């Protein structure tokens, strides 16, 4: 390992590694979302069929995501992350295999496995992002999400290029899964998780359960959770349906549909990279209000337009508006060091639920209202809810404890295997 890297402070190494993990996770997710039209055609799925399969496949992931905070408390971020990396790799490869075999049953099973693995990864990644921000004493959470967005752009381009070159879905998925899975485990061994106190799991698990569950009764946490849910639903709906909506709505090619998704993610990336300056200037509340207005305007332009050019402008506004919503929710949830881990876990859990419900929800609406382009307009509703609760992301006025003390509330990593 590079000596200069090893010479960095522990939390700085963790920051760089987590940026990398977010980035490759974006590549993995979006390299297959760009191939949804091919998967749909190979499995002969209608929008309703695809939505139903994704809904059934989300059940295991939903159970897992709500169990993740307790799993983190018992086993620590490192062990949960490692398990998620292995399960996610297996599920991703199986999605490609099920598509190649033309089996809806195998494809559905693969979605379940992939979702479970993704849930086991999502919560520890977001919890660690909050711990790292607290340790640095400055805003860094948007940078992790910017890395995911940058990886997503690369994944969209990869998927579009693979489609244009006629690369089989199964081959693309196998290569991406193995490379990303290996890099995740390598990052874990290199110091992805900041050391902390012993996991509660080395004692009775019930010791931590009240703290984990009590945040669900906190009014501010619930309202911030509404924002996290709205932001993730907006992003998840675009991820799953935008390329297909453009293909069906404007008779474009799959490759161009993948590039449209790349525009959405590319705009998100730019805003997330430079968004910290906007937050400093406008404040959290002003930044969130502007973000929600832009997202709603862009979504309306895309969903109601008959012009592909205007729709593309709408996609850019939608992506730029969505960009900072979830990072702001995570930052607000971690304002108070005591219990920050539980609140961030709550945000990640709600976001995962939103992402997993977005696909089937849009599929059902698309079947009833003439296709995914118009169905995506339903996302305006949660974005309006996010706009209404924007005032609750304002920083707490109470003094914040030493950031390093926050680490005492987090589980100890288990050595990577």
For the regions a protein language model found, what residue spans apply to each?
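Intracellular juxtamembrane helix-capping segments at the cytosolic ends
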Residues: 119-134, 323-337
């Amino acid at each position: 390992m590079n000596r200069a890297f090893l010479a960095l402070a522990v939390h700085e190494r963790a920051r760089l590694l987590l940026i990398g993990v977010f980035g490759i996770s974006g590549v993995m997710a979006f390299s297959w979302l760009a191939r949804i039209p091919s998967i749909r055609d190979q499995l002969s799925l209608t929008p309703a069929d695809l939505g139903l399969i994704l809904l059934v496949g989300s059940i295991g992931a939903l159970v897992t995501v709500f169990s993740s905070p307790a799993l983190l408390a018992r086993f620590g971020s490192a062990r949960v992350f490692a398990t998620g990396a292995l399960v996610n790799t297996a599920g991703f490869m199986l999605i490609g295999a099920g598509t190649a075999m033309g089996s809806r049953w195998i494809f559905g099973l693969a979605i379940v496995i992939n979702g479970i693995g993704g849930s086991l990864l999502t919560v520890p990644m977001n919890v660690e992002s909050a711990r790292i921000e607290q340790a640095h004493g400055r805003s860094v959470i948007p940078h992790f999400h910017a890395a995911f967005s940058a990886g997503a752009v690369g994944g969209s381009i990869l998927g579009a290029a693979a489609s244009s070159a006629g690369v089989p879905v199964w081959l693309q998925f196998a290569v991406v899964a193995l490379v990303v899975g290996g890099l995740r485990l390598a990052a874990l061994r290199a110091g992805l998780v900041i050391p902390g106190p012993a996991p509660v799991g080395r004692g009775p698990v019930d010791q931590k359960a009240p703290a984990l569950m009590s945040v669900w009764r906190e009014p501010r946490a619930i309202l911030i959770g509404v924002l996290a849910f709205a932001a993730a639903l907006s992003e998840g709906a675009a991820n799953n349906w935008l390329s297909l909506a453009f293909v069906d709505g404007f008779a474009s090619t799959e490759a161009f549909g993948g590039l449209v998704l790349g525009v959405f993610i590319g705009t998100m990336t730019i805003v997330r990279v430079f968004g910290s300056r906007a937050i400093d200037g406008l404040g959290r509340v002003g930044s969130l209000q502007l973000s929600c207005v832009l997202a709603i305007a862009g979504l309306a332009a895309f969903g109601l337009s008959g012009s592909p050019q205007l729709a593309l402008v709408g996609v850019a506004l939608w992506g730029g508006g969505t960009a900072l919503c979830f990072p702001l929710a995570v930052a607000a949830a971690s304002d108070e060091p005591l219990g920050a881990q539980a609140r961030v876990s709550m945000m990640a859990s709600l976001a995962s639920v939103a992402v997993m419900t977005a696909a089937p929800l849009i599929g059902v609406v698309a079947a009833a209202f003439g296709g995914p382009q118009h169905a995506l307009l339903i996302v305006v509703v949660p974005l309006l809810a996010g706009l209404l609760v924007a005032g609750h992301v304002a920083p707490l006025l109470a003094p914040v404890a030493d950031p390093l003390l926050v680490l005492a509330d987090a589980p100890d990593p288990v050595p990577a295997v």
